[in-house]
Amino acid sequence: MSSCALTGHRELQRDFSEDLLEKQLEDLIENGTDTFYCGMAVGFDLVCAKILLRCKERYPLKLIACIPHPNQSERFSAYWKKEYDECVAKADERVIVSKEYTDGCMQKRNRYMVDHADFVFAYLFSETGGTAATVRYAKQKGKPIRYYGQPYMPFYN
């Protein structure tokens, strides 16, 4: 069995498909991934969390909510706050990586996920920002990376 760190942008592009994402996550599960580290941010993270919670009805998997600080959702819209609260409540584990917000707490959360996972699944369309930095960090650590939108292929390391 293996573990996966999820990373992706808050903004979802027009061509983003939850159906495709669900198919890709199911492919990961069916090929041995049973633990997912999720940063619980607006956008890609919470969409993944919702899908994985649905998948738990059919597959034995574990969702670990990796929270950068206790007040992560305080500036979320009402819609995303509701999604966040539901997903965090249903997660198998909750890890809060910083006691309070600091300039580096998001990066610390992202590095925690990469350090604890066997590989990374990324929704990346920009070379800047937290997602790009997380992918670069994963590459530095020698972690395999799969990307949203690419067909499933076994890793060859």
Model-based region annotation:
Residues 1-157:
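Acidic/glycine-enriched connector segments
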